[in-house]
């Protein structure tokens, strides 16, 4: 038989594979990333076959030793991945057979299909990445919490519609992101727990007549249990969709933060100075200092979203059980994982070195009439004015301030009284911006007491989530 026909599945074929097919069909170029998982799964499978008497103990031991040798060759850069090997499973098995002999090497695939093998490999990879990304998220939450602790009294405008809305602290603003990322952490952990089941032993789609014990493989690989239906096991890519979705939401949160860093670092805002270590210059304009890291994270978010939509679209029309379309599941996941891990690493480092310009933030609170809601609330609480009427009166006060060319917080008692008789001298103290921030004592509010509780909650969570 010619070399091109010497494939694990070549017995049924009498013709040669087209070179076009060889290139088009092969996944070895990217699924070689799964070599650790593939070898770990094969070792667990061989041990189980030995424990069940399907292989002799010495055969199982020889296969495991051979797989260790293959792993060492790959990690030492001595393993040549070839397109003709088709995928990582065939590449590893072929090299194993070269090392220990084809008769013994050929026994490894007993009671196993590439369908459940790839389901195992890919699931192991995704579970490992769930843990890695969750660790990085936790580290970033710790950074945000530390920054918040340092900026309890840094006053800045809170925004809606990118317009000045109400005074808040920088600590409060940063904590909003900390709680966003905490939800991201919880999504990755939840997905890990839900998908921590071993599919190996499902074979092609219907299980196997060999007397295997799937739970032994699950235990060897530290799974919580085994999947319950073989057809579902080889068809399932929910775990891949989940990590793509979780990364998309994570990157969306990172993108929103980066958008603000981009705005805040501009001359128009001047709220933050990004370290030179995480900025770049212009090839023509000598004065430029560009927030390229933040812009790249913002841009890479679209890439992560695209990977999610691509796999959703691939999976939506597939009949049970395995289809070759599912080979398209991996590159997007690999790409999104690289995107998420690299983005989190550099975002965390950049935030640690960011310098917030407290005076510029404070100056910005003197624009936009940030105390307007407090004035309306005063009328409701102290003068028993219906809120809609209070809203109207306060709007008139804002218009009066603008006619005078000042901020609402700068109006004196006489100027307020000229707008409406309910705006007496007591109303003036409700225009104080620090007092405005401190007045919001409701749970989750901007008052320092509330913000400290939020910080304490996160610090307590951080101490427990590292277990």
UniProtKB/Swiss-Prot annotation:
Disulfide bonds: none
Catalysed transformations (reactions): 2-(N(omega)-L-arginino)succinate = fumarate + L-arginine
Pathway assigned to this chain's UniProt record: Amino-acid biosynthesis; L-arginine biosynthesis; L-arginine from L-ornithine and carbamoyl phosphate: step 3/3
Biological process annotations from GO: arginine biosynthetic process via ornithine; L-arginine biosynthetic process
Enzyme class, broadest EC rank: lyase
Domain of life: Bacteria
GO cellular component: cytosol
Record-linked SUPFAM superfamilies: L-aspartase-like
Keyword entries, A-Z: Amino-acid biosynthesis, Arginine biosynthesis, Cytoplasm, Lyase
GO terms of molecular function: argininosuccinate lyase activity
EC annotation from Swiss-Prot or TrEMBL: 4.3.2.1
Record-linked CDD domains: Argininosuccinate_lyase (cd01359)
Subcellular location: Cytoplasm
InterPro entries assigned to the protein according to its UniProt record, in alphabetical order: Arg_succ_lyase_C, Argininosuccinate_lyase, Fumarase/histidase_N, Fumarate_lyase_CS, Fumarate_lyase_fam, Fumarate_lyase_N, L-Aspartase-like
Pfam families: ASL_C2, Lyase_1
Keyword set includes Cytoplasm: yes
UniProt cross-references to PANTHER family, sorted A to Z: ARGININOSUCCINATE LYASE
HAMAP family documented for this protein: Arg_succ_lyase
NCBIfam families: argH (TIGR00838)
Entry similarity comment: Belongs to the lyase 1 family. Argininosuccinate lyase subfamily.
UniProt-recorded name of the protein: Argininosuccinate lyase
Native organism taxonomy: Bacteria, Pseudomonadati, Campylobacterota, Epsilonproteobacteria, Campylobacterales
Gene from which the chain derives: argH
